[in-house]
Design a protein with these regions (language model features):
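Residue-level signal for alpha-helical context at structural boundaries
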Residues: 26-27, 98-101, 120
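Short, flexible coil/linker segments at or flanking structured domains
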Residues: 34, 65-67, 189-192
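Intrinsic-disorder/low-complexity, polar/charged segments
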Residues: 20-24, 56-57, 94, 154, ...
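Acidic/histidine-rich catalytic cores and adjacent linkers
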Residues: 50-51, 107-217
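Conserved beta-strand -> loop -> alpha-helix junction used to position metal-binding or nucleic-acid-contacting
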Residues: 46-114, 125-126, 130
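Short, charged/polar low-complexity linear motifs in solvent-exposed/disordered segments
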Residues: 29-31, 90, 100-102, 159-162
Length: 217
């Protein structure tokens, strides 16, 4: 099953085939034709789960959507899922923690948004504490993860920052085990996964100037 969706989460088309890759050209060209017929501009970027880049320099996705000149990027969720191959099991007690830290290696919070949220929470604190100023620790404790996701944007870190942080994360988890002694990471497999995936760090970069968030009330 291959699906194509838009920025609003709507599925524009899908194809179910008996073999991987079959029918994709007709699927993609159908979308190109529909955009052209209604006078809609081609998308600035296409996010994919594979084939984001090529040794020849031209992604197969670019060829499928010809003549569009949209940038092609690798979806971060699918990038992170590739690291599961280097773990002993997804049922390991430390699996969730590893995934959360891996996400933090890829994304950073917009500091202007974070500062705006902190100022709003500071005002709430002072209103409910007779005007007293909260400490930084108290202020941060009032911000829930849900509030931060709702009010603050994230963006991808630079290639070298991602490389450095993921390398540091892997170094920190090599020897971690659960209470039975089961390791979180399979050393040999994870070494190979990381070696291969480093070439895709450029594919995770947000296109310059592209607005990836929709403002809601």
């Amino acid at each position: 099953m291959t699906n194509i969706g838009n920025e609003f989460g709507q599925v524009l088309n899908s194809v179910l085939t008996t073999g991987e890759g079959a029918g994709l050209e007709e699927l993609c060209q159908g979308i190109v034709t529909r955009y052209k017929n209604v006078g809609k501009d081609e998308p600035e970027v296409i996010y994919v789960d594979r084939d984001c880049c090529s040794q020849s320099g031209v992604s197969s996705v670019t060829k499928l959507f010809h003549p569009w000149r949209s940038a092609v990027r690798l979806d971060s969720f699918h990038f992170m899922r590739r690291f599961n191959c280097g773990l002993t099991t997804e049922h390991h007690p430390l699996y969730g923690t590893f995934c959360a830290k891996l996400s933090s290696c890829i994304f950073e919070w917009d500091q202007e948004d974070v500062q705006g949220l902190k100022e709003a929470k500071r005002g709430e604190w002072k209103s409910s504490h007779s005007g007293h100023e909260p400490t930084e620790e108290q202020l941060l404790a009032t911000i829930t993860s849900g509030e931060q996701r709702r009010h603050c944007r994230r963006r991808s870190r630079g290639v070298e920052d991602i490389r450095r942080m993921i390398s540091g994360l892997l170094e920190s988890v090599w020897e971690l085990t659960d209470t039975t002694g089961l390791r979180l990471v399979n050393h040999d497999t994870m070494h190979h996964v990381w070696e291969v995936q480093q070439k895709h760090l450029e594919c995770l970069q947000d296109p310059p100037g592209l607005k990836l968030y929709t403002k809601v009330v």
